[in-house]
A protein has these predicted regions:
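RNA-binding accessory domains that recognize and position tRNA/RNA substrates
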Residues: 1-125, 129-130, 144
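Hydrophobic beta-strand scaffold residues
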Residues: 28-29, 115, 163, 181, ...
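Short amphipathic alpha-helical segments
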Residues: 43, 106-109, 147-150, 175-179, ...
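Beta-strand-turn-beta hairpins that frame and shape the catalytic cleft
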Residues: 87-93, 200-203, 239
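Hydrophobic residues at beta-strand termini and immediately following loops
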Residues: 96, 118, 184, 227, ...
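Cysteine-nucleophile active-site neighborhood
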Residues: 134, 139-205, 211-213
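Catalytic beta-strand/loop cores that center a nucleophilic Ser/Cys/Thr
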Residues: 202-239
Length: 239
């Protein structure tokens, strides 16, 4: 959604136009929109459903009621695979893929980890039997509370193997430990989200893209370690 689309890009790194990229990846787009006005609406009303269309439908009820259901199985890897580091293997890590960004596995490999990427249907018993040095729970889409099976598997892993959850993985860990999550009125989006270390004096500038948060008051088995400096919401928990 843009105010004005450039049809003749000139950057030396550009391989194709925005229009060609969107068509190649089957992504809808629209130009000529007053994006500042849209921003003001979202600022006051919060996150809402929207549609790109050539005419306003007579009945908006289906649009208002629309919601994405069970998205994690749609974006997970269908089969396990392993990525090796360039040098010696220092650790073996299982990365449970709930919609993982490639950079997570890439950064683990840089640190000497052999990363086995597992589908979201992975069983806790199989993970423990494989003897991994640690388990990484990836980012992913949707309402964390809908992932009942994944939460149960994480609960079986708690206290038995070192774990680190990021984004959805962090939220699922909190749910597995008895906490709860809720939808943010204003999701955290962008590359400049400030996060405070509650046990120190540092504030980190982070990249975020999530619309749900862990309820800090429900984290009984852990301690809130990081909080968003803008709205005070939970950003990280130590268990």
């Amino acid at each position: 959604v843009v105010r004005e689309a450039c049809s003749t890009p000139s950057n030396f790194r550009c391989a194709q136009t925005l229009d060609a990229f969107l068509k190649e990846n089957n992504i809808p787009g629209i130009a000529g929109i007053d994006t500042r006005a849209v921003t003001r609406i979202l600022r006051e009303a919060g996150t809402m459903n929207a549609a790109i269309c050539d005419a306003v439908p007579d009945d908006l009820a289906p649009l208002r009621a629309y919601r994405i259901t069970d998205p994690v199985p749609q974006v997970t890897t269908p089969e396990p695979y392993t990525l090796q580091p360039e040098g010696s293997v220092l650790h073996r890590v299982a990365l449970i893929d709930y919609g993982a960004k490639r950079n997570i596995a890439r950064e683990l490999c840089k640190r000497g980890c052999a990363v086995t990427v597992l589908p979201c249907s992975a069983k806790a018993e199989d993970i423990l039997a494989a003897g991994y040095d640690g388990v990484m729970l990836s980012n992913g889409p949707g309402d964390p509370a809908e992932n009942v099976y994944q939460i149960e598997q994480i609960r079986k892993l708690l206290g038995k193997v070192p774990m680190f959850g990021i984004c959805l993985g962090h939220q699922l860990t909190a749910l597995a430990a008895g906490g709860s999550t809720y939808k943010l009125k204003y999701g955290h989006r962008g590359v400049n989200q400030p996060v405070r270390d509650m046990e120190g004096v540092r504030t980190y500038i982070t990249s975020q893209n999530h619309g749900y948060a862990v309820d800090s008051d429900t984290v009984k088995l852990g301690k809130v370690r990081f909080a968003n400096a803008n709205d005070g919401t939970c950003e990280g928990v130590d268990y």
